[in-house]
Amino acid sequence: LEAELAARDERRVRTSLKLSGLPSGHTLSNFDFAFQPSVERSRIETLATCAWIREKESLLIQGPPGVGKTHLAVALGVRAIENGFSVAFHRLEDLLAALKRDADVSPQRLRQRKHMNVALLIIDEVGFEPMTRSEASLFFRLVSYRYGRGSILITTNKGVAEWPAVLAGDEVL
């Protein structure tokens, strides 16, 4: 019985990883903490417990290019799947394209979209390119809808003070 349960869990994890869109190969065990001493291993290990996902809190990983933001985001996504959470990974550019396609979809059908109802939505590369006003509005609607319903993990190379420029120059968004 124990072997059967372990096999089922392994299949669930494997299937969930495929469905999530997470790039393969990024785990916490292969993240080079020595290369990036500014990343506190203890803080990442705390995040890896997934308590923040259980509480439907969100996370921002900010830093310059090449420091491992995406690696950490994906590794936390893998850990979330291992802990039974549903996960979807999108680069912002791809997510905005999906949101534009869904702009005229009824609210009931929109709720069925993966990016709306997973436990953890990972949005990579926010701020790589500035958003148009309509893109910023769609992004805000997504974040607003998910508030209190599910966690969002965002990676960005922009500090929070730079976000108005990313969000079509709108300080309110």
Would you name each region that the model predicts?
Residues V39-N117, P164-L167:
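Conserved P-loop
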Residues L1-S24:
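Interdomain "pre-motor" coupling segment immediately N-terminal to P-loop NTPase/helicase cores
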